[in-house]
């Protein structure tokens, strides 16, 4: 139960039994990933910025207080790092789309790895003694494939995960839009449907959201959605506040006292789908699982007129009593406790 990405990597010398472990960082340093190259360790942290930065410090004498900033925060959210012989590979989020970049050792700026489609590019493996990296690439309309990136930054499909007969339907399209919420925040909304779907308000539509723990809903192909899409259904995914699509700031804007933003964002996305004639309130359903039950449950009680169906899949609907359940205590950091007023 519970969720959190912060880590505390320790250090000890290989081949010297009894060597004391050295703590490189604490959870307060907000480090979520790290990579090692030579005598240096690179730390991905959201301490300097809610959109993350990469710091470098010495393995011999780690000191985050004097660590050098190798990659500064930008509009994109850094999500993962990996060290290879030719450079430091960076996984970053540009809205719902994930990209991979390479910062050659000694260079100031990272170059984007060119991939055949936009979707979710994720680092899988890299080694400081081998050039290049292995990554996966998936999209809303295409299943995951494995690519090898060479030291020159060229990506080649390894064919290690070949597409099946139904893994890349040519009749599906995905559109990325941003929807204005109740307070002006722009919420990323991904809309997937058949290319011949008519925008006449008649399409059955399922709107999915989660909005907790800073978890982002990124592009991914779901074969179980094919029957829905083939029958002219529309599937939409909203990265409401509480997700990590724009980093820690976006996450904290849908957290505890700001939690109402999550369902108000979902309501705004539902209204957008209706206004743009994808569907109507008589044919619109919303789906949220686990913590997403709070999202869809409160959207339902606030705007019952807007939805024809609500699916809380193993959904949390009673946040007040949730901490008394077997899995309740680990989730107190996310939702708070009835024993303490905040």
Locations of regions flagged by a protein language model:
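Alpha/beta-hydrolase fold active-site loops
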Residues: 187, 204, 283
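Active-site-proximal cap/loop segments of hydrolase catalytic domains
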Residues: 231, 237-342
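Structural cue for short, hydrophobic secondary-structure segments
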Residues: 208-211, 227, 237
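Short loop/turn segments immediately following beta-strands, especially the blade-tip
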Residues: 13-16, 58-62
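Short coil/turn segments that connect the beta-strands within blades of beta-propeller domains
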Residues: 39, 85-86, 130-131
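Glycine-rich His-Gly loop
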Residues: 46, 138, 208-214, 290
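Non-catalytic accessory segments flanking enzyme active sites
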Residues: 1-36, 80, 91, 98, ...
């Amino acid at each position: 139960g519970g969720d959190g990405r912060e880590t505390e990597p320790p250090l000890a010398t290989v081949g010297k039994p009894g060597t004391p472990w050295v703590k490189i960082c604490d959870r307060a340093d907000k480090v979520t990933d790290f990579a090692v190259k030579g005598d240096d360790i690179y730390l991905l942290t959201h301490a300097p910025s809610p959109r993350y930065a990469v710091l470098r410090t010495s393995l011999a004498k780690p000191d985050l207080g004097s660590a050098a900033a190798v990659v500064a925060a930008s509009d994109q959210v850094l999500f993962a790092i990996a060290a290879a012989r030719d450079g430091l590979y960076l996984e970053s989020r540009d809205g719902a789309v994930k990209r991979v970049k390479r910062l050659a050792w000694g260079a100031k700026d990272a170059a984007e790895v060119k991939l055949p489609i936009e979707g979710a590019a994720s680092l899988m493996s890299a080694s400081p003694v081998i050039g290049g990296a292995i990554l996966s690439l998936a999209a809303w309309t295409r299943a995951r494939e494995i690519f090898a990136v060479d030291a020159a930054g060229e990506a080649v499909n390894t064919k290690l995960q070949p597409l099946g007969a139904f893994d890349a339907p040519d009749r599906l399209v995905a559109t990325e839009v941003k929807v204005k919420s109740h307070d002006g925040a722009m919420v990323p909304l991904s809309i997937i449907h058949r290319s011949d779907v008519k925008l006449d308000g008649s399409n059955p539509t399922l709107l999915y959201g989660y909005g907790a723990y800073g978890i982002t809903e990124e592009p991914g192909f779901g074969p179980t959605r094919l029957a829905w899409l083939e029958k002219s259904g529309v599937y939409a995914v909203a990265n409401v506040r509480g997700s990590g699509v724009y980093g820690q700031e976006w996450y904290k804007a849908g957290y505890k006292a700001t939690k109402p933003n999550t369902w108000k964002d979902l309501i705004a996305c539902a209204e957008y789908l209706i206004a743009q004639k994808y569907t109507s309130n008589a044919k619109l359903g919303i789906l949220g699982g686990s913590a997403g039950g709070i999202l869809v449950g409160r959207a339902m009680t606030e705007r019952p007129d807007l939805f024809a169906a609500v699916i809380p899949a193993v959904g949390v609907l009673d946040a007040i009593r949730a901490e008394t359940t077997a899995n309740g205590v680990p989730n107190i950091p996310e939702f708070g406790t009835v024993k303490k007023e905040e």
